[in-house]
Amino acid sequence: EVILGYLPEDIDYAHPNIGEDDCTGLMTQGAHLTMPHMQWMFYLPRICNHCTYPGCLAACPRQSIYKRPEDGIVLLDQSRCRGYRECVRGCPYKKVYFNAQTRVSEKCIGCYPAVEGGRQTQCTMTCIGKIRIQGFLDAPDKVSEDNPLDYLVHVKKVALPLYPQFGLEPNTYYIPPIHVPPAYLRQMFGWGVEQAIATYRKVSEDPKLLGALTLFGATPEISHYFRVDGDSVVGYDAKQAEIARVPIKEPVVIREVYDSKHRAFRTNIT
């Protein structure tokens, strides 16, 4: 079947984030104290979803796009690409790009050399906000509660795919923001978004869920398994060797104003 799609125009690439930082409108006094907010914005980091049924793969007449069976990463063989841009047209997420200089398409490679070595992707490891985790998701009928991704996606269902209505089964999952009107989030993440937000709001009452979230950005290696051990969460690699141990609640150290050892006053500057 012919895949319906569209090619972005030059202006789409020239100003990809135009207006995204703008949030204007009338707000009554005290409205910021209630949620969802009447005026709101949020950042949505988007990468290639490495879909189970990639639209770019189906659209390419040169068969230059393929999905690796061992890890599900979708790659583009540039030696076969002739720059028809059908992959760009076929991807509804627009995460395949045409390089006007090389005259071939290019896309995220899922950092497959790192993944082969048991390490997380570059965007995951360099995220200063520690909002990302990368790993392997099991099928819904083979869920392992010790797998942090299975626990977030299949068990607690707090992480949802973006635009599931496209039918491509994207493999990047998002924890929805809590301050945005549900009607807007529903069209982005599907009908489970209200329950996901309700579960996330009660994360302080769920040590295991809190532990899984604490693993975000805790180690450069892929955590295949995890468990909560007292006040800490422990991550394990594929061989169940410990690779990370992080306190669920960050310890607080209060320093005395006067340092008697150095006979000096401490001053906090922020």
Say what each PLM segment does.
Residues 1-270:
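Non-ligating segments of multi-cofactor redox enzymes
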